[in-house]
Amino acid sequence: MINEIKKETEDKMKKTVEALRKEYQHIRAGRANPALLEKVTVEYYGAPTPVNQLANISAPEARLLVIQPWDKSVLPALEKAILKSDLGLTPTSDGAVIRLVIPQLTQERRSELVKTVKKRAEEHRVILRNLRRDANEDVKDLQKEHIISEDEGKRAQEEIQKLTDKYIREVDQVAERKEAEIMEV
């Protein structure tokens, strides 16, 4: 019983940290990264379609993304979708490919991004703490039903606390790395 609770809690905590890593991929750090366009969708045959399903996206240089659509007729729609997105990038097209030059981040924009990174990290720490609380409540329920002893319950809660500490440290490390990446000039 206790092992199931711990395993389930740890799985959820791993997923929380992975979700944070994925979120951070969408935060522009001044470098070209095809993941920046993952959330951009284009109206294609009446359905919103992600850019990466309509084109090949590559980063031939540190500050350049090249989008090569498989169907050239979708070029204007791709340009519009990129302009409408919250990326703040202006696409340039030569009729065959779209080039996105990633501008250098200003100090002000860097500070805003760092605040966003810290906010997201705190949100994920709260999620981890809520998972800990839920697991501890499950352990207490087992104690109340006399399925486990008080000592086993205490030991389980200590192990859950260690798991929580481990994953909070991981969130902190992921956030620190992203902050360093953003502040890198």
From Swiss-Prot:
A cellular-component GO term for this protein: cytoplasm
Coiled-coil region: none
Chief site of localization: cytoplasm
Annotated Gene3D superfamilies: 3.30.1360.40, Ribosome-recycling factor (1.10.132.20)
Entry keyword Transport: no
PANTHER family (UniProt xref): MITOCHONDRIAL RIBOSOME RECYCLING FACTOR PSEUDO 1, RIBOSOME RECYCLING FACTOR
Name of protein: Ribosome-recycling factor
